[in-house]
Swiss-Prot record:
Localization of this protein: Cytoplasm; Mitochondrion; Nucleus
SUPFAM superfamilies associated with the record: GST C-terminal domain-like, Thioredoxin-like
Subunit structure: Homodimer. Interacts with CDK5.
Catalytic activity from the UniProt record: RX + glutathione = an S-substituted glutathione + a halide anion + H(+); prostaglandin J2 + glutathione = prostaglandin J2-S-(R)-glutathione; prostaglandin J2 + glutathione = prostaglandin J2-S-(S)-glutathione; prostaglandin A2 + glutathione = prostaglandin A2-S-(S)-glutathione
Entries under InterPro entries matching the protein: Glutathione-S-Trfase_C-like (IPR010987), Glutathione-S-Trfase_C_sf (IPR036282), Glutathione_S-Trfase (IPR040079), Glutathione_S-Trfase_N (IPR004045), GST_C (IPR004046), GST_pi (IPR003082), GST_superfamily (IPR050213), Thioredoxin-like_sf (IPR036249)
Protein source organism: Bos taurus (Bovine)
GO biological process entries: glutathione derivative biosynthetic process; glutathione metabolic process; hepoxilin biosynthetic process; prostaglandin metabolic process
Protein name as annotated: Glutathione S-transferase P
Residue list for modification Phosphotyrosine: 4
Gene that this sequence comes from: GSTP1
Top EC category: transferase
Every GST N-terminal domain range: 2-81
Length: 210
């Protein structure tokens, strides 16, 4: 039986970064898909610590909060930088990813039609810090921090990929980010996952907007 279980809705949402991480690291996991109708009936929602998903099982350990899950996998699978300084930078990057993800989620679920044009116009200022970070690390030819992949790379990659769906030209003025996405997308195990029906058939968001 796989050591990990992801309990989540039938969407990419806040779980695709951890799925990409697990796939790229050669880990197996089980999916428990929760239909919205079942969720709204209440028992599972009431049993969840914060009343929300994802829920993540690692053996006897139950975790909630997607970023806590990513950090846990980072620690257990050696994806948290090579020392404390790199770990601090990985945390900083991941917090930056979360800031932009929250803006994205707000657009998708509360203001898509009225807000998309302004959101896309403002997007370059939110992407620029990641381009800057890449430029400061081996000229942008490696990962976002150091010379080994971290959990923040998977989270950033997911964020960039969903923005390429929202605004296909969003990385045109960011050559390092564009090359970074292409480079990570081509990692053999990750490439296989991204081409799989499990990923391809899973909508990005729960309301059909992307």
């Amino acid at each position: 039986m796989p050591p990990y279980t992801i309990v989540y809705f039938p969407v990419q949402g806040r779980c695709e970064a951890m799925r990409m991480l697990l796939a790229d690291q050669g880990q197996s996991w089980k999916e428990e898909v929760v239909a919205m109708q079942s969720w709204l009936q209440g028992p599972l929602k009431a049993s969840c610590l914060y009343g929300q998903l994802p829920k993540f099982q690692d053996g006897d350990l139950t975790l909630y909060q997607s970023n806590a899950i990513l950090r846990h996998l980072g620690r257990t699978l050696g994806l948290y930088g090579k020392d404390q300084q790199e770990a601090a930078l990985v945390d900083m990057v991941n917090d930056g990813v979360e800031d932009l993800r929250c803006k994205y989620v707000s657009l998708i679920y509360t203001n898509y039609e009225a807000g998309k044009e302004d959101y896309v116009k403002a997007l370059p200022q939110h992407l620029k810090p990641f381009e800057t970070l890449l430029s400061q690390n081996k000229g942008g030819q490696a990962f976002i921090v150091g010379d080994q992949i971290s959990f923040a790379d998977y989270n950033l990659l997911d964020l960039l990929r969903i923005h390429q769906v929202l605004a296909p030209s969003c990385l045109d003025s960011f050559p390092l980010l564009s090359a970074y996405v292409a480079r990570l997308n081509s990692r053999p195990k990750l490439k296989a996952f991204l081409a799989s029906p499990e990923h391809m058939n899973r909508p990005i968001n729960g309301n059909g907007k992307q």
